[in-house]
Amino acid sequence: MLLLCHILAVTILQILIISENWVFAKNINFYNVRPPLDPTPFPNSFKCFTCENAGDNYNCNRWAEDKWCPQDTQYCLTVHHFTSHGRSTSITKKCASKNECHFVGCRHSRDSEHTECRSCCEGMICNVELPTNHTNAVFAVMHAQRTSGSSVSSVPSPYLLVLAWLFMLPLL
């Protein structure tokens, strides 16, 4: 009986892990972008997601041109226009200088009922997300690791670890 409970617990855990992967399989994990292995054009080079007037964040990030930012830029800028219902109307992402990052935050236009939120960040491909309010429309300095030898490990979700522990507890 104990062996049967153990096999059942392991099977349920495997099903949960596999189903989690199926749920997220349709989405690209833009956070898991590794630093490029090709030589950089100059010291402290970086890349940003870049797009001009994209309709949504997914397509902006997915089809972003993969090129190094110019040497006179230090940050990634994101400009997000959206309706009062939160629907994106325009997304622009690009490499930016410090001067272009002075005007971060959100501004609501009463005439057109649209909001524009601007954010800047520092680091390799740091502009994954869209600014949507005053808490994330900020100038964020995040020093990304820029080594080509770094490896990204897959860490299971915390709730799966708790679930596994709960299944194994009766067997102990």
Curated annotation (Swiss-Prot):
Entry keyword annotation includes Signal: yes
Cell compartments where the protein resides: Cell membrane
This protein's record includes keyword ATP-binding: no
Residues anchoring lipid (GPI-anchor amidated serine): 148
Domain of life: Eukaryota
InterPro entries in the record: LYPD6-like, Snake_toxin-like_sf
Topology in membrane: Lipid-anchor; GPI-anchor
Disulfide bonds: 48-76, 51-60, 69-95, 101-120, 106-117, 121-126
Keywords, ordered alphabetically: Cell membrane, Disulfide bond, Glycoprotein, GPI-anchor, Lipoprotein, Membrane, Signal
Residue span of region Sufficient for inhibiting alpha-7 nAChR currents: 46-140
Signal peptide: 1-25
GO molecular function: acetylcholine receptor regulator activity
Propeptide, chain numbering: 149-172
CC per GO annotation: plasma membrane; side of membrane
Domain UPAR/Ly6: 46-137
Family annotation (SUPFAM superfamilies): Snake toxin-like
Function: Likely acts as a modulator of nicotinic acetylcholine receptors (nAChRs) activity. In vitro acts on nAChRs in a subtype- and stoichiometry-dependent manner. However, according to another report in vitro it can weakly inhibits alpha-7 nAChRs.
Annotated protein name in UniProt: Ly6/PLAUR domain-containing protein 6B
Source organism (scientific name): Mus musculus
Biological classification of the source: Eukaryota, Metazoa, Chordata, Craniata, Vertebrata
